[in-house]
């Protein structure tokens, strides 16, 4: 697909999904145009009932804890990821790079803990490389 769409005047909602970008594009076409610029409103992918996800660089992944307490967010990879944790409004709570933990031999993985509130949304995002991200309610370093 070449990325071009020819539209007659009207209002359109297009869904975009691909490597590194997902979201909904809303655009109003009022006359014949040669170019159209639309913002992509990124949405988050839910962890659902799982405690791990393969996280692509730049994507948001939403986690909603079932109980209040300390949660541990960490990567297991062969790459060099950096982890970001955001609150329900996507305000940055913390970012971590190169933090060792017992579940990986890669010293470039990340590991962070945060006191989360039950029922609230938390967003995880990675940069550097796509990785497996895990969320646990017990310290993975204490599990061994």
Feature roles, as predicted:
Residues 1-24, 54-139:
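Acidic, Ser/Thr/Pro-rich low-complexity intrinsically disordered segments
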Residues 28-49, 141-144:
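Predominantly extracellular/luminal regions of secreted and cell-surface proteins
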């Amino acid at each position: 697909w070449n990325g071009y769409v020819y539209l007659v005047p009207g209002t359109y909602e297009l869904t975009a999904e691909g490597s590194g970008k997902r979201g909904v594009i809303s655009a109003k076409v009022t006359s014949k145009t040669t170019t159209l610029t639309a913002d992509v409103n990124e949405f988050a992918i839910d962890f659902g009932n799982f405690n791990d996800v393969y996280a692509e660089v730049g994507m948001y992944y939403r986690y909603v804890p079932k109980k209040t307490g300390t949660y541990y967010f960490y990567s297991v990879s062969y790459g060099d990821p950096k982890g970001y944790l955001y609150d329900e409004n996507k305000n940055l709570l913390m970012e971590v790079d190169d933090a060792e933990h017992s579940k990986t031999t890669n010293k470039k993985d990340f590991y962070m803990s945060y006191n989360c509130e039950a029922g609230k949304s938390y967003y995880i995002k990675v940069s550097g490389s796509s990785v497996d991200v895990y969320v646990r309610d017990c310290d993975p370093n204490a599990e061994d």
